[in-house]
């Protein structure tokens, strides 16, 4: 499609097969996958482009040190910090153009921390077991696209293959869109609104735009 590079963020000790499948699907679209390993305790189930050792080092603690007394409480913040530093740097340098990840509660928490550090408009797709409920803790105010995994992410099956293929298609499609956030020429005014104030907000926007301002509206709840 677009010849872009897509980050695949995954714990390769538990989701190596799924990450490899995502890589293959992304490559079918003519894009390149850059697999970042955020796993800790087990050997990676597929070859990473960015190793868990590199991620841990970027997070401020060597992997060997984490493995002396492995625990989620220690490992998760380090790997999240390391992955965030690596991916945001690559994005700022224009070397990656989208990110897709998959996980349960822990994987979603780690991966969306990385995603929330990326700019608005940068494609972010999170395949998650948690996406059928309240996703506010993971999305917050960022443009993270949450995709429900339907099944647990534990091996490949007909449903999981289709979901991951859809996720690859989604992130590659987003990365191929050439629309960018425009530089602002007019002063920008924020408006908050909710159902019963919609008409008033629309009138306020009309008046402001006629006066030479640009408006951006946020839902108040």
Roles of regions detected by a PLM:
Residues 16, 41-43, 130-135, 153-155:
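Short gly/pro/ser/thr-enriched loop/turn and capping motifs at secondary-structure boundaries
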Residues 5-11, 66-75, 96-103, 187-194, ...:
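Short glycine-rich or small-residue beta-strand-to-loop segments that form or flank ligand, phosphate
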Residues 47-95:
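Phosphate/nucleotide-donor binding subsite
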Residues 14-17, 21, 74-82, 106-109, ...:
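Conserved active-site and cofactor/substrate-binding residues in soluble primary-metabolism enzymes
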Residues 98, 110-139, 148, 216-220:
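Short, acidic/small-residue loops that bind anionic groups at enzyme active sites
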Residues 2-44, 98, 107-117, 121-126:
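N-terminal phosphate-binding or glycine-rich loops at protein starts, especially the Walker A/P-loop
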Residues 15-27, 34-35, 40-53, 184-221:
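Glycine-rich phosphate/diphosphate-binding loop of Rossmann-like nucleotide-binding domains
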Residues 65-68, 134-196:
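Cap/lid and interdomain-hinge subdomains that line or gate substrate/regulatory clefts
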């Amino acid at each position: 499609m677009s010849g872009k590079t897509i980050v695949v963020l995954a714990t390769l000790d538990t989701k190596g097969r799924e990450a490899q499948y995502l890589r293959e699907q992304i490559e079918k679209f003519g894009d390149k996958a850059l697999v970042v390993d955020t796993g800790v305790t087990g050997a990676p189930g597929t070859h990473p482009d960015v190793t868990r050792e590199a991620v841990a080092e970027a997070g401020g603690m060597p992997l060997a040190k984490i493995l002396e007394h492995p625990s989620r409480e220690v490992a998760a913040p380090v790997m999240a910090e390391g992955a965030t530093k690596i991916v945001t740097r690559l994005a700022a340098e224009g070397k990656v153009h989208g990110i897709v990840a998959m996980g349960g509660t822990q994987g979603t928490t780690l991966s969306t921390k990385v995603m929330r550090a990326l700019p608005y408009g940068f494609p972010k797709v999170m395949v998650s077991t948690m996406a059928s409920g309240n996703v506010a803790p993971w999305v917050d105010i960022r443009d993270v696209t949450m995709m429900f995994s339907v099944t647990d992410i534990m091996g490949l099956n007909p449903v999981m293959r289709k979901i991951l293929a859809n996720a690859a298609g989604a992130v590659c499609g987003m990365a191929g869109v050439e629309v960018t956030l425009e530089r602002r020429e007019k002063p920008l005014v924020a408006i908050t609104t909710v159902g019963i104030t919609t008409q008033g907000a629309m009138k306020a926007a009309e008046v402001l735009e006629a006066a030479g301002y640009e408006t951006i509206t946020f839902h108040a709840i």
